[in-house]
Design a protein with these regions (language model features):
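A short helix->loop->beta-strand "cap" motif at the edges of active sites that frequently abuts
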Residues: 144-149
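Active-site phosphate/pyrophosphate- and oxyanion-stabilizing loops and adjacent acidic/basic residues
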Residues: 60, 139, 185-188
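Solvent-exposed, acidic/flexible segments
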Residues: 40, 51-55, 127-134, 177-180, ...
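N-terminal secretory targeting modules
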Residues: 1-43, 47-54, 64-65, 99, ...
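Catalytic His-Asp segment of secreted/periplasmic serine-dependent ester chemistry enzymes
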Residues: 155-256
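Alpha/beta-hydrolase-fold catalytic nucleophile elbow
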Residues: 107, 153-154
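Generic structural signal for well-ordered alpha-helices
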Residues: 93, 134-138, 184
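Conserved SGNH/GDSL esterase-like catalytic core that processes O-acyl groups on lipids
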Residues: 38-41, 47-132
Length: 256
């Protein structure tokens, strides 16, 4: 009788242990897949575009950790209002598919300043001012996919008084610190109108491109550019820990 009781207890213990191990294995499996069923859409300028400037960019680091799908619409020279050869963000929205996205980030852009564009206010709804174009961009995105979680990311600091084209062919006079400060304040104010979360890289990113040593180590530097605008792969690696929790929060909230 005691042997049978012991046998029953042993079997029960084995069943319990097997159940616990199964639960742990299932938990580890789903933890390993991360956000594999989620899609992160990226809009941005040359810091988001896949170019020679960084073999590994911020979104590569984030994707490796979170395992989400990434659709990258980053383009060189683009911004909320930047026009001419590049369409602005509010026009790009009309050309891309947002229906399958779970979250979207817009990163940038100081391409908008230094071109004599009027800054405007956070209440503008017009193509004539930068503030108006920010509003138009966000409104179009939210109308296209109301369930999409949208996050706004301010530009990282650029080299003070950076001028892309000294010959003036791009009509770019340079980025003063005052212009950059005002631009970021406006972008944050516009985002707050729609209760959108903001990742403020302008104030939180620790690298200072005005420092020559920092620029040499963490920014693109070759015969074509030494401008303190585009972080290299190491610069993106330092930026990545700020991006990861921001994107993870957006993905976690999506679909709710």
């Amino acid at each position: 009788m005691l042997k049978k009781l012991h046998l029953h207890k042993t079997r029960a213990l084995v069943i319990v242990v097997a159940f616990v191990l199964t639960v742990l294995l299932i938990s580890q499996f789903f933890a390993g897949t991360g956000y594999a069923s989620k899609t992160w859409i990226i809009m941005g300028d040359s810091l988001s575009a896949k170019t020679f400037r960084a073999d590994t960019a911020y979104y590569d680091y984030v994707q490796k950790d979170l395992r989400c799908k990434v659709i990258n619409y980053g383009k060189n020279g683009i911004g909320y209002k930047e026009s001419g050869q590049k369409e602005p963000f509010y026009e790009q929205v009309d050309e891309i598919d947002l229906s399958d996205g779970d979250c979207l980030t817009i990163f940038g852009s100081f391409n908008d300043i230094g071109k004599n564009f009027e800054l405007g206010s956070s209440d503008d709804i017009t193509e004539e001012t930068i503030g108006g174009c920010m509003n138009l961009t966000i409104r179009k995105i939210l109308a296209s996919n109301p369930s999409l979680r949208v996050g706004i990311v301010t530009p990282t600091p650029w080299l003070t008084n950076f001028a892309f084209d000294p010959n003036g062919e791009q009509n770019f006079s340079g980025t003063s610190r005052e212009e950059c400060d005002a631009y970021v304040s406006l972008l944050i104010a516009v985002a707050e109108k729609y209760n959108l979360p903001v990742l403020d890289l302008y104030h939180e990113f620790e690298l200072n491109p005005d420092d020559p040593d920092t620029r040499a180590k963490y920014y693109v530097e070759n015969e074509h550019e030494d401008v303190g605008v585009h972080p290299n792969s190491e610069g993106h690696r330092i930026m990545y820990p700020l991006w990861k929790p921001f994107v993870e929060d957006l993905l976690s909230d999506s679909g709710k």
